[in-house]
Amino acid sequence: MKGKKYYSDYHVWIEPIHSRIVKLGLSSQMREHLGNILHIDLPSLGAFIKEGEKLCILESSKSAIEVLSPVSGEVLEVNTALEDDILPVNNATESEGWFVVLQLTEDFRSESFSLEP
């Protein structure tokens, strides 16, 4: 499971790190649809994010959207480098452009997600 990426209906990729720890980011397919990302508003360290609720806000050349979380958990790590340099979201969406690392409320269930965006 570690190293694989899974994709949600919310256009967010999920990379399991441990059974209850995952890294989240925007699918490259959605990034292409949005156009050039200009700004991101990320959650705070320690915040609790619920499945289906706001994970972050992205402002692009086309629109501003709320990105919804595909899972529930506490924010363990935030990619704060994106606040100073948004380029990784545009150029390395599914690697250096990750948003947060979450500690899930329950074990990650890969069968709920797709292996393709």
UniProtKB/Swiss-Prot annotation:
<dbReference type="InterPro" id="IPR017514">
    <property type="entry name" value="GcvH_Chlamydia"/>
</dbReference>
<dbReference type="InterPro" id="IPR003016">
    <property type="entry name" value="2-oxoA_DH_lipoyl-BS"/>
</dbReference>
<protein>
    <recommendedName>
        <fullName>Glycine cleavage system H-like protein</fullName>
    </recommendedName>
</protein>
<keyword id="KW-0450">Lipoyl</keyword>
<dbReference type="GO" id="GO:0019464">
    <property type="term" value="P:glycine decarboxylation via glycine cleavage system"/>
</dbReference>
<dbReference type="GO" id="GO:0005829">
    <property type="term" value="C:cytosol"/>
</dbReference>
<dbReference type="InterPro" id="IPR011053">
    <property type="entry name" value="Single_hybrid_motif"/>
</dbReference>
<dbReference type="GO" id="GO:0005960">
    <property type="term" value="C:glycine cleavage complex"/>
</dbReference>
<dbReference type="InterPro" id="IPR002930">
    <property type="entry name" value="GCV_H"/>
</dbReference>
<dbReference type="Pfam" id="PF01597">
    <property type="entry name" value="GCV_H"/>
</dbReference>
<dbReference type="InterPro" id="IPR000089">
    <property type="entry name" value="Biotin_lipoyl"/>
</dbReference>
<feature type="modified residue" description="N6-lipoyllysine">
    <location>
        <position position="62"/>
    </location>
</feature>
<dbReference type="InterPro" id="IPR033753">
    <property type="entry name" value="GCV_H/Fam206"/>
</dbReference>
<feature type="domain" description="Lipoyl-binding">
    <location>
        <begin position="21"/>
        <end position="103"/>
    </location>
</feature>
<comment type="similarity">
    <text>Belongs to the GcvH family.</text>
</comment>
